Amino acid sequence: MQDYKIKIENVVASTQIGENIDLNKISREIKDSEYKPKQFPGLVLRTKEPKAAALVFRSGKVVCTGSKSVEDARRAVKQIVKMLKEIGISVIDEPEVKVQNIVASADLGVDLNLNAIAIGLGLENIEYEPEQFPGLVYRLDNPRVVVLIFGSGKMVVTGGKSPEDARKAVERISEELRTLGLM
């Protein structure tokens, strides 16, 4: 397999830490928290190591974003749970963390003719309107992801549930492009 410099850019994960979470108390007691209920119903907590941001909702749902790996997302959630326990908020000790989305970047290392690719890959799974957006949008079923392909050969893979989904998508696309003689 060729090295396409696949890099995880963002992991979005969610969990349930309890119910009836007192966001006002968290806002008062954790100085770096952000809570503006008139603008948005969630409270923002940030972790420094690993670097991540978490939206905490009164319902107990937590959405963690900004991690560079699934493990970092889990570590960030653990830190959030610890922070909340320290100020007396009743939360689940080890909540189940579920990956919702992984965004990865990759580089095929060659310039691409997106017009030829749009025709070659078949228009049913492709959106390409260069006047609207410079990238070609390719929807894959297996793995179930959306890939943005740019003329520079760079790609963004989104919608995956594991790092493996990004790797499979990049390998599949590079193989399809090679088979079509477009790479």
Curated annotation (Swiss-Prot):
Gene that encodes it: tbp
One GO biological process term: DNA-templated transcription initiation
Keywords: DNA-binding, Repeat, Transcription, Transcription regulation
Matching Gene3D superfamilies: TATA-Binding Protein
UniProt xrefs under HAMAP family: TATA_bind_prot_arch
Ranges of the Sequence repeats in the UniProt entry: 8-84, 99-177
Species in which this protein is naturally found: Archaeoglobus fulgidus (strain ATCC 49558 / DSM 4304 / JCM 9628 / NBRC 100126 / VC-16)
Classification via PROSITE patterns: TFIID
InterPro entries, per database record: TBP (IPR000814), TBP_archaea (IPR033711), TBP_CS (IPR030491), TBP_dom_sf (IPR012295)
The family this protein is said to belong to: Belongs to the TBP family.
Protein name (Swiss-Prot/TrEMBL): TATA-box-binding protein
GO MF term list: DNA binding; DNA-binding transcription factor activity
